[in-house]
Amino acid sequence: MARVTVEDCLEHVENRFELVMLSTKRARQLATGGKEPLVQWENDKPTVVALREIAEGLMSYEFIAEQEIVHEDPVFAAFEDESNEAV
């Protein structure tokens, strides 16, 4: 796809506001989250790649939410350990 238009993207999202939010989250994932693009990266910026993914119908809120789930250890796990108690 040579040029992405808003009309191409609006076929897959309900309105322009949702388009802005979805493309912003996806572009941030591509730029900083280490997520792999679903379309070929043709020397484009992350925002253009995100819009191309939306225009091709490959991106949705469900997909982004699924990728944002991170399984981490609890922040206070060290406090639960009895060996860390003050004497």
From Swiss-Prot:
GO biological process, one term: DNA-templated transcription
Source organism (scientific name): Pseudomonas fluorescens (strain Pf0-1)
Catalytic reaction annotation: RNA(n) + a ribonucleoside 5'-triphosphate = RNA(n+1) + diphosphate
Keyword presence, Cell membrane: no
Family affiliation: Belongs to the RNA polymerase subunit omega family.
Purpose of the protein: Promotes RNA polymerase assembly. Latches the N- and C-terminal regions of the beta' subunit thereby facilitating its interaction with the beta and alpha subunits.
InterPro entries named in the record: DNA-dir_RNA_pol_omega (IPR003716), Pol_omega/Rpo6/RPB6 (IPR006110), RPB6/omega-like_sf (IPR036161)
This protein's name: DNA-directed RNA polymerase subunit omega
The protein's Enzyme Commission number: 2.7.7.6
